[in-house]
Amino acid sequence: MSTTAKEAPSSLFSLLPNDIVLNILARVPRWYHPILSCVSKNLRFLVSSSELKITRSLLEKDRFYVCFQEHSNSPSLTTYHWFSFTENRRCLVSIPFTSPVEPYFATLTLGPEIYFVGKSRSMWILDSRSGKLRQGPRPLVACDQAAVGLVNDKIYVFGGIDDMNKRYYEGIHAQVFDLKTQTWHVGPNLSVKLACLNRSVVTPSLGRKIYVRGTDRDVTIYDIKDGKCDKIIPADDFSSGDMCVVDNVIYMYYHNVGLMWYESKEKQWSVVHGLEFNGVFNSIAIAEYNGKLAFLWHDRNKREIWCAMINLYGSSKVAIRGRVEWSHRLLSDLPSNYNFKHFTICTDY
């Protein structure tokens, strides 16, 4: 085969109009986007464009789910209730998802699947398309109150202690699940001890390290290569505990300040300007959704769940502004013994 023939498919693809290319890219799973960005400058531009996010939104490629934990006097009677967000009606609809029996501490989504880890020496995987639950390969050790992160087709589970004895299980601080080989192995031990963790995110623009929010209110940066940990000083003592990444920028909500973003070069938190709903909310949950920031809160007085969809714009090198695209009540008459358990985004239907 001649060189011209080998290059023909790539050349023909580059000649297609951008609107056709966008429709093709919108149907490609998001975890392939970093690879596509390396093909050409035009593809790199289109993969990160707002037009692609809008196209994916119209195709309903991303969906978000909310799980509530129904508390009872007996731990064995604790139940979980799942709801799916319906965008055209802007409401939460109850769905018959099956949850693991154990109160799993951490979740991680990979495409349409939700992984549950922590609390016991097991891992469960929920397929959001079928609602079916299956058990995955057993972790090396159990871990209570641990954090998870996904980097390069590997799930990192780290931190967490034996809640009874207040020590790390068998001296293992971190364990890694290889999605390709479906096997677990010991990961780089953390250079500091992190007992209680409650949120983690990964951002490719910052060296594919894992950022973890702990109960000490600090954010710890875990380096997957050697286990080295650095700390980010919190902007305020009253944060929501939840954080997310939108376009490779980390966001966190602070009750006394508002929504903030992390400026990695200066190593400081800055306020997202232009938002008027800053205040004290109960049970905050935030996540990236179609390139926007979905901001959920629980109004306990009215027993309602509300959501604001926020557009973020500006430069992470200068300033970032936010604009509320819409704010709407998603659920009413929520029982008083229901609490937020999981808020997760599944992609690529």
UniProtKB/Swiss-Prot annotation:
F-box domain: residues covered: 11-58
Keywords: Kelch repeat
Protein name listed in UniProt: Putative F-box/kelch-repeat protein At4g02310
Kelch repeat residue numbers: 154-204
Residues making up the signal peptide according to the UniProt record: none
Keyword Heme: no
Gene3D superfamilies, alphabetized: Kelch-type beta propeller
